[in-house]
Amino acid sequence: MPGSPDEPVPNNRPEEISMTDKHTGACFCGAVTIEVTGKPEAMGYCHCSSCRSWSAGPVNAFTLWKPENVTVTKGREFLGRFKKTEKSDRQFCTKCGGHIMTDHPTFGLTDVYAATIPSVAFAPGVHVNYSETVLRMKDGLPKLQDFPAELGGSGVVVPE
């Protein structure tokens, strides 16, 4: 899959992440903490209008994990949810509003926002939904029109 940590990433220095690695993260105020184990399935940037709106930024930096590798370790009672579509179950802290992660049931993956787990060296490998971009990024990474074919997208690569 484009963006997987096993694929060489140009212009970056990916850290070796073993299957036994554990990383912790938290929301903005620290009321909700999470732990991820193993290694992410992929890392990259999403340019879709939904992610841009949710993140209040021009692009979302994602790390995708198998759901069983993501655990809320503290503050589950402060975990709010917002589901705009069936494709994304967004989770946030009800105390500070900090965005934590999004479950993507159609992909069978959980997106833990890269900034939420700072000890994981962010090594992006792909741009998704680049046809919706508002911020052109010339970084040599593949730019997909939508999603990889193995996740139900077209897999079409578009120019930088």
PLM region descriptions:
Residues 8-160:
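A short Gly-Trp-Pro
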